[in-house]
């Protein structure tokens, strides 16, 4: 199941060099989120574990020889100059002094304002794809550093591996067995609202003094989401969705929401739960992925 989204333009402009196959931009889940403190610059020190899921936006890029960067379809509520894909493309073009451009299409499946990282993932996919299509040969560390300027979540999508994250989310430790989480099935529930991340982190009642934990501690205890109490208070729709989903198991909030999720024993269990879904909620049956599908797409060129 997936949300509907924008369209990709059907016709290739005459000044376009070539059209590539679509590039996936996966959603992520925060399997836990602890906030350790606030830095002098206003950002928060945190710990989290990012895992990808197979709910993906789809990015298409037609390379242009005239240097113009253009979004070829509207995304509701997102102006072109604010679009992270466009900003990512322009940032890479400037940093690399590249004369080429691109027509960028985004087919949205990841809901906006859900805590699933859709915008950051789209930006990361654009950086990885354009680095390949423009033949820049930037190393992944350089791409991740550029991506960090666009958002704290962008580097994990560029690196493409399930990760333990610290700092503002940019200090990443890739996780491999036995430390990697299982690639479980999940049911993600989205209430019909979006959550303003900045508003949650600015709330005076936000927990900001959690003690640091280790990866082994997370694997043993599972952790929690320190944003949960503030999100519940500010957004009753999220609270109701979480309470409903918690009737089927230990439901969690991802990021600052609005999405909540539940690990499943089977896809059949997920389908049974969806059969009882209240009409105000959207459901996404997904599978956890420890390697981003973007890496597989990059491998085929």
Regions found by a protein language model. Give the residues of each.
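ATP-dependent small-molecule kinase catalytic core of the GHMP/sugar-kinase superfamily
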Residues: 2-5, 9-24, 30-45, 136-250, ...
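Short aromatic/hydrophobic contact patches that present stacked aromatics
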Residues: 113, 188, 259-261
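Glycine-rich beta-strand-to-loop/alpha-helix junction loops that act as flexible
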Residues: 118-119, 254-258
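Conserved hydrophobic residues forming the short capping helix/wall of the S-adenosyl-L-methionine
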Residues: 89-93, 131, 249, 274-277
């Amino acid at each position: 199941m997936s949300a509907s989204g924008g369209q990709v333009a059907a016709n290739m402009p005459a000044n376009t060099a070539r059209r590539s196959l679509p590039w996936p931009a996966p959603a992520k889940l925060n399997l836990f989120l602890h906030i350790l403190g606030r830095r002098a610059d206003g950002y928060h020190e945190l710990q989290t574990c990012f895992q990808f899921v197979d709910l993906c936006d789809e990015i298409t890029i037609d390379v242009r020889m005239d240097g113009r960067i253009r979004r070829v379809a509207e995304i509701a509520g997102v102006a072109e100059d604010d679009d992270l894909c466009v900003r990512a493309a322009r940032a890479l073009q400037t940093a690399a002094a590249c004369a080429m451009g691109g027509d960028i299409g985004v087919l949205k499946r990841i809901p906006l304002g859900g805590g699933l990282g859709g915008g950051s993932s789209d930006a990361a996919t654009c950086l990885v794809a354009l680095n390949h299509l423009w033949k820049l040969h930037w190393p992944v560390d350089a791409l991740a550093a550029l991506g960090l300027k666009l958002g704290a979540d962008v580097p994990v999508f560029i690196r493409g591996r399930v990760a333990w994250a610290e700092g503002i989310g940019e200090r990443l430790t890739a996780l491999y067995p036995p430390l990697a989480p299982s690639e479980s099935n999940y049911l993600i529930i989205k209430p019909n609202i979006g959550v303003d991340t900045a508003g949650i982190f600015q709330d005076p009642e936000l927990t900001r003094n959690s003690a640091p934990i280790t990866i082994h501690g997370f694997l043993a205890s599972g952790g929690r989401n320190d944003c949960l109490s503030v999100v519940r208070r500010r957004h009753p729709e999220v609270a109701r969705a979480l309470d409903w989903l918690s009737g089927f198991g230990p439901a969690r909030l991802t990021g600052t929401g609005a999405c909540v999720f539940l690990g499943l024993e089977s896809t059949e269990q997920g389908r049974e739960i969806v059969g009882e879904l209240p009409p105000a909620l959207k459901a996404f049956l997904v599978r956890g992925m420890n390697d981003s599908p973007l890496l597989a797409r990059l491998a085929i060129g």
